[in-house]
């Protein structure tokens, strides 16, 4: 058991340290250097002045990655907020109200989840004009279904418990039951899913930008930087390796953090298996 806590604490420390470093670095770089073209400094090698060198327009790669983190992480957070608001709200009503509302939502989710979500995202993103804001819409229209299904499942398991029956018996308003009694039961599982999905959404945003459906030049964004670096993989591989490494490390950190949170949640519920 001690090993489990040690692992979780280490992962949490790495997670917090990563976020802290990203935030602090924002104050030491200029967004102007991320987009300003300087053709006299194209393909500069790695140095103290340019920690990762420069690209084909003379822009500092390190600065672009740090500023790109602002774009990627902000859009990811915004997308998650939209997903949670829509998904949890529908899940609460579907699980509590039952009847035709639940059946309609479940049938829609069954159809939506039967198709690979990334394919649908590509179709939706292609329908809109390429931009980061339209990626928020495209991803939200797909990812809310997982949160609705999870929320409904938890609500269903709580509906037959005495505290809900007593609240209904004393005619406690539905809004009060949903917000004060059921929502706290949902929050831990939703937080775990959010942390795990954070990495997935970063991957979706980067992938869609890589194929030209997200951020457009000269906006510094990790996926768009991958697309740009692809053309120089032989002559200047750092242009591809740097953003790819940042994406991979970020996704790994959030996935490990999500796993650690899930383990702790299961332990608190008394469901954790010591042999895990």
Swiss-Prot record:
Gene disruption phenotype: Deletion of the nikBCDE operon strongly reduces nickel transport and urease activity. Mutant shows decreased virulence in a mouse model of ascending UTI. Insertion mutant shows attenuated growth in several infection models.
Keyword Signal appears in the UniProt entry: no
Keyword Ion transport: yes
Cellular component GO terms held in the UniProt record: plasma membrane
GO BP annotation list: nickel cation transport
Induction of synthesis: Transcription is stable during the exponential phase and increases only in standard conditions in late exponential phase.
GO molecular function annotation: transmembrane transporter activity
The name this protein goes by in its record: Nickel import system permease protein NikC
CDD domains: TM_PBP2 (cd06261)
Assembly information from the UniProt record: The complex is composed of two ATP-binding proteins (NikD and NikE), two transmembrane proteins (NikB and NikC) and a solute-binding protein (NikA).
Alphabetical UniProt keywords: Cell membrane, Ion transport, Membrane, Nickel, Nickel transport, Transmembrane, Transmembrane helix, Transport
Segments forming domain ABC transmembrane type-1: 69-258
Coiled-coil portions: none
Physiological role: Part of the ABC transporter complex NikABCDE (Opp2) involved in nickel import. Probably responsible for the translocation of the substrate across the membrane. Required for full urease activity and plays a significant role in the virulence of S.aureus during urinary tract infection (UTI).
PROSITE patterns the UniProt entry points to: ABC_TM1
Gene that encodes it: nikC
Membrane topology: Multi-pass membrane protein
One Pfam family hit: BPD_transp_1
Family: Belongs to the binding-protein-dependent transport system permease family. OppBC subfamily.
Location in the cell: Cell membrane
SUPFAM superfamilies tied to this protein: MetI-like
